[in-house]
C-alpha cells in the first residue's frame, strides 16, 4: 500500500512516475493493462506508464483465434470471483459498444450424459449468467424437440445466455483503446524478467504458456493443451451448442467456430491435420446433421496454457545491478483465458497499484510448489 499511503499524505504528487512493463499481447496482457488503467481511474490515482512487450505478431498467437464463450470450467471461489469481474466488464462493453468491441450476446445449450458435470456448471456460473435453466423433456426428446434424442438416453442439457468475446475482434479493440491512452507496444523477445527490471518498477508476466519459463520458477507446473478450431460459414447458427465440452459450435459476429480437441501434454503436430478435421466434423455432424453442408473457412491449432490454477502472485526481485523491482504474475488460465482474464487482471492490477486486497482474502489458493523443470515441449513451442 506504499503508493496509496504516500499519495494520501502528500508524499507523492502523482503515481505517473510508476513504470509498468507487461509481457504478453494476448488477452491476459491486454486485459491486465486495461484493468490497471480502469482501476487507477476508479480510485482517482494517476495512471502509471505502461509498455507492453510481445515477441510474436498478433496473427500467430492463441488469443487471435479464440471464440471466447463465457463459461467457467472450475467452480473454485477465486475462479468465480474472476468470472464475475470479467462478466461485469463484458456487460459494460456490450452496453456501450456492442459488437464493435468484439463482444456478442448469445444463448445456447450444453448437453451431457453426466448429471454431475451439468450440476457443476450451475455451481460455477449458473447464478451469474442470464436465463440459466435445465432443458425440459420436450426440448430434448421427440419430433418437435431441438435435438430429437432417443428417449432411452441419459443425455440431459442446460440453457443459458452470456457473452462471447472473439479474440479476432476483442483483442484489437482493447489494444486500440490502450493506445489512445498512451500505452506503448514493442515486438521484442524477453529472455527473463530481470531484463526489464532495470528499466521498470513493475514487470507483469502475462506470457501465457511460457509464463512459467519466463518466471524461472514455474515451468514444470505448466503444460500445453493442444486444441483445434475450425471456422465455418453457417450464418443461420445463432445458438452455441456443446456436447460434453469438447464437441462444440460457438457463433460469433459473422461466422461460427466448430471444435475441438483437448490433448493435454501434446506439443504437436503444429498444424491442423486431416485426422483433426475428420474427428471434429464427424463428432459434430452426429450432433447437428445440418453441419455436413457447411463450408470451412479456416482452421487453427493452438496450445492452451495448462496449469492447476491461475497464478496471480507478487514477487520482489533484484537485477544484476542490485535494483529491486516488483514482479506480478498473471498466467496459467488453461482454456478459460477469455472468461477469467479480466477478473484475474483486476486482481493483478490491485497488486501493481499497491492497493488493498481485501476482496481476495480467503479466496486465493496456496501457491503451487516451485517447479523450474524445463519440459521437452518448451523447445518445440518456444518460437
UniProtKB/Swiss-Prot annotation:
Provide the leader sequence positions.
1-17
Q: Which Pfam families match?
A: DAO
Q: What do mutants without this gene show? A: Mutant worms have high D-Glu content at both egg and young adult stages and a high L-Trp level at young adult stage but do not show any change in physical appearance. They also have decreased egg-laying capacity at 20 degrees Celsius, and decreased hatching rate and smaller brood size at 25 degrees Celsius. Mutant worms also show delay in growth to adulthood and an extended life span. Impairs the nose-touch response. Does not decrease male fertility.
GO cellular component: a single term: cytoplasm
GO MF, one example: D-aspartate oxidase activity
Provide the alphabetized UniProt keywords. Answer: FAD, Flavoprotein, Glycoprotein, Oxidoreductase, Secreted, Signal
| Expressed in which tissues | In both sexes, present in coelomocytes (at protein level). Expressed in hypodermal cells and the proximal gonadal sheath cells in adult hermaphrodites (at protein level). Also expressed in probable head mesodermal cells and unidentified cells in the head, and vulval muscles in adult hermaphrodites. Expressed in the seminal vesicle, spicule and tail cells in adult males (at protein level).
Q: Which InterPro entries match?
A: D-amino_acid_oxidase_CS, DAO, FAD-dep_OxRdtase
Top-level EC class: oxidoreductase
Q: Has UniProt tagged this entry with the keyword Secreted?
A: yes
Q: Entry's SUPFAM superfamilies?
A: FAD-linked reductases, C-terminal domain (SSF54373), Nucleotide-binding domain (SSF51971)
Binding of FAD occurs at: 56, 63, 339
EC id: 1.4.3.1
UniProt catalytic activity: D-aspartate + O2 + H2O = oxaloacetate + H2O2 + NH4(+); D-glutamate + O2 + H2O = H2O2 + 2-oxoglutarate + NH4(+)
Where located?
Answer: Secreted
- Essential cofactor(s): FAD
Q: What is this protein called?
A: D-aspartate oxidase 3
What gene, per UniProt, encodes this protein? ddo-3
Amino acid at each position: 500500500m506504499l503508493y496509496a499511503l504516500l499519495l494520501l499524505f502528500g508524499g507523492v504528487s502523482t503515481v505517473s512516475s510508476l513504470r509498468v512493463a507487461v509481457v504478453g499481447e494476448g488477452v491476459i496482457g491486454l486485459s491486465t493493462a486495461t484493468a490497471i488503467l480502469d482501476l487507477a481511474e476508479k480510485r482517482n490515482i494517476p495512471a502509471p506508464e505502461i509498455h507492453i512487450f510481445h515477441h510474436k505478431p498478433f496473427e500467430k498467437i492463441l488469443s487471435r483465434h479464440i471464440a471466447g464463450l463465457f463459461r467457467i470450467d472450475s467452480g473454485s471461489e477465486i475462479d468465480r470471483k474472476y468470472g464475475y469481474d470479467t462478466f461485469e466488464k463484458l456487460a459494460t462493453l456490450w452496453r456501450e459498444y456492442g459488437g464493435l468491441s468484439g463482444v456478442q450476446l448469445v444463448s445456447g445449450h450444453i448437453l451431457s450424459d453426466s448429471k454431475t458435470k451439468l450440476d457443476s456448471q450451475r455451481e460455477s456460473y449458473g447464478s451469474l449468467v442470464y436465463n440459466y435453466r435445465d432443458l425440459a423433456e420436450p426440448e430434448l426428446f421427440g419430433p418437435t424437440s431441438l435435438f430429437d434424442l432417443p428417449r432411452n438416453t441419459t443425455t440431459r442439457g442446460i440453457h443459458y445466455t452470456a457473452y462471447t468475446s472473439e479474440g479476432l475482434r476483442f483483442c484489437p479493440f482493447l489494444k486500440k483503446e490502450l493506445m489512445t491512452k498512451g500505452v506503448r507496444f514493442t515486438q521484442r523477445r524477453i529472455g527473463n524478467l530481470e531484463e526489464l527490471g532495470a528499466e521498470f518498477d513493475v514487470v507483469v508476466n502475462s506470457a501465457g504458456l511460457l509464463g512459467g519459463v519466463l518466471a524461472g520458477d514455474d515451468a514444470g507446473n505448466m503444460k500445453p493443451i493442444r486444441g483445434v478450431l475450425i471456422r465455418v460459414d453457417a450464418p443461420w447458427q445463432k445458438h452455441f451448442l456443446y456436447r460434453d465440452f469438447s464437441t462444440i459450435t460457438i457463433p460469433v459476429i459473422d461466422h461460427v467456430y466448430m471444435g475441438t480437441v483437448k490433448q493435454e501434454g501434446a506439443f504437436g503436430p503444429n498444424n491442423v491435420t486431416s485426422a483433426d478435421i475428420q474427428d471434429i466434423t464427424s463428432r459434430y455432424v452426429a450432433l447437428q446433421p445440418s453441419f455436413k453442408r457447411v463450408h470451412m473457412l479456416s482452421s487453427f491449432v493452438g496450445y492452451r496454457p495448462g496449469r492447476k490454477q491461475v497464478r496471480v502472485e507478487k514477487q520482489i526481485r533484484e537485477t544484476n545491478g542490485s535494483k529491486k523491482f516488483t514482479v506480478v504474475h498473471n498466467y496459467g488460465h488453461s482454456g478459460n483465458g477469455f472468461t477469467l482474464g479480466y477478473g484475474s487482471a483486476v486482481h493483478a492490477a490491485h497488486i501493481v497499484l499497491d492497493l488493498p486486497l481485501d476482496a481476495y482474502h480467503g479466496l486465493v489458493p496456496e501457491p503451487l510448489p516451485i517447479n523450474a523443470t524445463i519440459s521437452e515441449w518448451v523447445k518445440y513451442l518456444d518460437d
